[in-house]
Every structure is written in C-alpha cells, then in structure tokens.
Amino acid sequence: MQLILLEKVANLGNLGDKVNVKAGYGRNYLLPYGKATAATAANLAAFEERRAELEKAAADKKASAETRAAQLAELEVTITATAGDEGKLFGSIGTHDIADALTASGVEVQKSEVRLPNGTIRNVGEFDVAVHLHAEVEATVRVVVVAA
C-alpha cells in the first residue's frame, strides 16, 4: 500500500515522503490517525497545495514539544507508595501513575508518552524515566519513589 506521510513517523519517514507499508499498518494506524493519506494523483496534488501549511503545523508541534521538554528537564517528581521493609512495593508504579504525577506538577503528559523500557517500577528509589513528546523530542525526568 502506497501512502503519503502527512507528518514525521518514527522509523518510517518524514512529512511528504511517499512510502510503501503493509495494508494493515496503513488501514489500522496511519490513515485513521491522520498521519498519512493514500498516494493517488489527486491526493498528491492536494498535498503539494497544503505542504506549507502542514510543515508549519509540524514545526509548531515540535516547538511546543521542545518547550514541554525544557519544563520536564527541570522536574523531579516524588511518588508515595506502600512498601515492605526491604523497599519492595505492594503493587507497582506504571506509566499512568507517572503521567498523573507529572500532570499534577504542572506539565501536561499523556501516559502513552511515558516510556518504561524495563517495565513498571517495583522498588523504592530514584529512577530516570524517558518521556517521548515528539518523534524528535524526548525528555528525561527523575522519579523518586518513597515508602508511605
């Protein structure tokens, strides 16, 4: 399936690239989320007319993500959770908990933007958590988990 990308997509291409993807990826992700359009002659012409507008929108999104990244870089979030004597949590701290704590501290973060490559946090301590704000912008936040 040939598509024209309407924004930068990680591991696929940039705005305006004509790419070949599997039909399921195109139909179920790229097209419904407005990240691409079918590569027909009419859509190519319409895209070229809107290219400047789309590039400006992409630049605005990146600029707002960089602003949020600068705010997040200064943050250190403390999350209180019940834990046993040896520092092992009863339960865990996941992306939803971290996103809620960051939002409460003044920076709007969605849980899908929080990246925990090693899985949920299950111990008391300090952790560096990556927050993926844009395809090109990522911030690191210090999360401190303390026992209640």
Swiss-Prot record:
GO cellular component: ribonucleoprotein complex; ribosome
Coiled-coil residue spans: none
Annotated SUPFAM superfamilies: L9 N-domain-like, Ribosomal protein L9 C-domain
InterPro entries on file: Ribosomal_bL9, Ribosomal_bL9/RNase_H1_N, Ribosomal_bL9_bac/chp, Ribosomal_bL9_C, Ribosomal_bL9_C_sf, Ribosomal_bL9_N, Ribosomal_bL9_N_sf
GO molecular function, one term: structural constituent of ribosome
A Gene Ontology biological process term: translation
Superkingdom as given in the UniProt entry: Bacteria
Keywords: Ribonucleoprotein, Ribosomal protein, RNA-binding, rRNA-binding
Membership in a protein family: Belongs to the bacterial ribosomal protein bL9 family.
Function: Binds to the 23S rRNA.
Family matches, as HAMAP family: Ribosomal_bL9
Protein name, as recorded: Large ribosomal subunit protein bL9
Originating species: Pseudomonas fluorescens (strain SBW25)
Taxonomic lineage: Bacteria, Pseudomonadati, Pseudomonadota, Gammaproteobacteria, Pseudomonadales
